[in-house]
Design a protein with these regions (language model features):
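Basic, helix-initiating cap at the start of DNA-binding domains
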Residues: 1-48, 56, 61-62
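Residues at secondary-structure transition points
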Residues: 8-12, 16, 58, 66, ...
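Key DNA-contact positions within bacterial/archaeal DNA-binding proteins
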Residues: 51
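Amphipathic alpha-helical linker/stalk segments
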Residues: 65-95, 103, 107, 146-150
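Helical hydrophobic small-molecule/effector-binding pocket
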Residues: 69, 90-125, 170-176, 205, ...
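Amphipathic alpha-helical packing segments from all-alpha helical-bundle domains
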Residues: 90, 101-102, 106, 110, ...
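Hydrophobic/aromatic-rich alpha-helical bundle segments in the mid-to-C-terminal region
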Residues: 127, 149-199, 211-215
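C-terminal alpha-helix
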Residues: 144, 198-210
Length: 215
């Protein structure tokens, strides 16, 4: 969770304090944006000293990366634990639904909007956001697809490419655009369930079981 788990001088850092800093920073990034969020403001919000922040994170960029990764890691375990049992459809539906609901959450959309609006640091922030969030989720999806392929449930010869395509089905949902002007509709459970069911059905149709593919 923290960047400097052993601290700058080899001493273990306080993990609970590090989490407090990350939580405060994430809220400020969402509220104020990257440029307006300073380490002084983070220290004030977290009720810690600025020195305490530097004991955990080398820079504001490192803190931003940790905040994005922490947010992602909070929902990812639940997303994939829900998909342990059941058919391929049930497992993928659990993952896809959790992913889309997370993408639709106000704070995630706010961070994305903040990154896109930050012309000064957009490139570097986009890289940090990708590494802390999407890249991690895609890796988890890849692992699930490898298992489904190994068990001959689905035919997934290229798990990396298929994981990226699966994630794109939800990242590319029109509900993310609709959320900008009609959030009630975009966040409606029936709308989300309908979209996810169709997306998963299409993905499974493109990755038929090995036995079917060789028949």
């Amino acid at each position: 969770m923290t960047q400097n788990s052993q601290g700058r001088r080899g001493r273990p850092t306080n993990e609970a304090l590090g989490q407090t800093i990350v939580d405060a920073a994430y809220k400020l990034f969402v509220e104020l944006g990257f440029q307006a969020t300073t380490l002084d403001k983070v220290a004030q919000r977290a009720k810690v000293s600025k020195l305490s922040i530097y004991r955990h994170f080398e820079s504001k960029e490192a803190l931003f990366s940790a905040a994005i990764a922490d947010r992602c890691h909070q929902f990812a375990p639940q997303m994939f634990s829900e998909s342990i049992d059941g058919s391929a459809e049930v497992q993928l539906l659990a993952v896809g639904s959790s992913l889309l609901r997370t993408l639709l959450s106000p704070d995630v959309r706010s961070v994305e909007a903040m990154v896109m609006a930050d012309k000064k640091s957009q490139k570097s922030l986009s890289k940090l956001q990708y590494e802390g969030g999407p890249a991690y989720v895609i890796a988890q999806i890849e692992a699930l697809l490898r298992q489904l392929h190994k068990n001959e449930v689905l035919d997934v010869p290229d798990p990396v490419a298929s994981a990226r395509l699966f994630a794109a089905l939800f990242k590319g949902s029109d509900l993310l655009i609709i959320a900008r002007f009609d959030p009630a509709r975009a966040e409606d459970s029936k709308e989300i369930d309908s979209y996810c069911t169709s997306a998963v059905a299409m993905f499974i149709a493109a990755h038929g079981a090995k036995s079917e593919a060789t028949a």
